[in-house]
């Protein structure tokens, strides 16, 4: 079973990739370089604390890097699509890249294309879903969701979900790390089911949550 992971060059994504590589062979990694830009301030000191926390949490401050990755500016570009075609994957997993466009999906109609979303699709679509969930004090919806990818962002059918548990010993900057551990768990479960030809019931997504952009830094204070 050939697997493609579409992601970006961050410590939490590196941890995700490395953990799955321990469990599954023939994983190919594509890193997207494209960045989001906003008309409002999104940078916050919390992000520096988060980076430091994740470096220790995942790697005990060791300098770990991606290996054998392929880098493209945009996963939707022709060169990236052609590269994936040559690999002939059974599954494409998106974690942290930008919008996957229709031209990409049309090229891989026979491939399972799935995405990891840090929230409940029925309430929170878009960016920074965990932060928006916490902002609204909606702690019951702190979820990690694995869903199919459709043209409209975060409207795919739900494959698996897992709660992201927060506790008194978990700092605010550790929430993304906790979510990443949940991401590893549900993707491993999904891939094992495919490998064993087991059927995972997919829940039709009939309620599309509100779309949120990146959370402004002023709301984190």
Regions found by a protein language model. Give the residues of each.
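One-carbon transfer enzymes
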Residues: 1-221
């Amino acid at each position: 079973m050939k697997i493609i992971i579409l992601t970006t060059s961050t410590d939490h994504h590196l941890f995700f990739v490395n953990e799955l590589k321990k469990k599954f062979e023939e994983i190919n990694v594509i890193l997207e370089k494209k960045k989001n830009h906003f008309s409002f301030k999104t940078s916050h000191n919390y992000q520096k604390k988060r980076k430091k926390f994740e470096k220790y949490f995942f790697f005990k401050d060791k300098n770990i890097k991606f290996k054998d990755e392929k880098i493209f500016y945009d996963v939707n570009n022709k060169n990236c699509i052609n590269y994936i075609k040559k690999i002939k994957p059974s599954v494409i997993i998106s974690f942290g890249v930008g919008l996957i466009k229709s031209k990409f999906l049309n090229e891989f109609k026979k491939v399972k294309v799935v995405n990891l979303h840090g929230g409940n699709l029925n309430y929170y679509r878009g960016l920074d879903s965990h932060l928006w969930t916490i902002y609204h004090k909606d702690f019951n919806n702190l979820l990690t969701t694995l869903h199919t990818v459709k043209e409209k962002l975060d409207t795919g059918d739900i494959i698996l979900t897992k709660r992201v548990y927060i506790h008194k010993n978990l700092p605010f900057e550790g929430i993304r790390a906790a979510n990443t551990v949940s991401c590893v768990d549900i993707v491993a479960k999904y891939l094992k089911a495919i490998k064993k030809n087991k059927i995972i019931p997919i829940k039709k997504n009939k309620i599309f949550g509100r779309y949120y952009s990146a959370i402004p830094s002023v709301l984190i204070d």
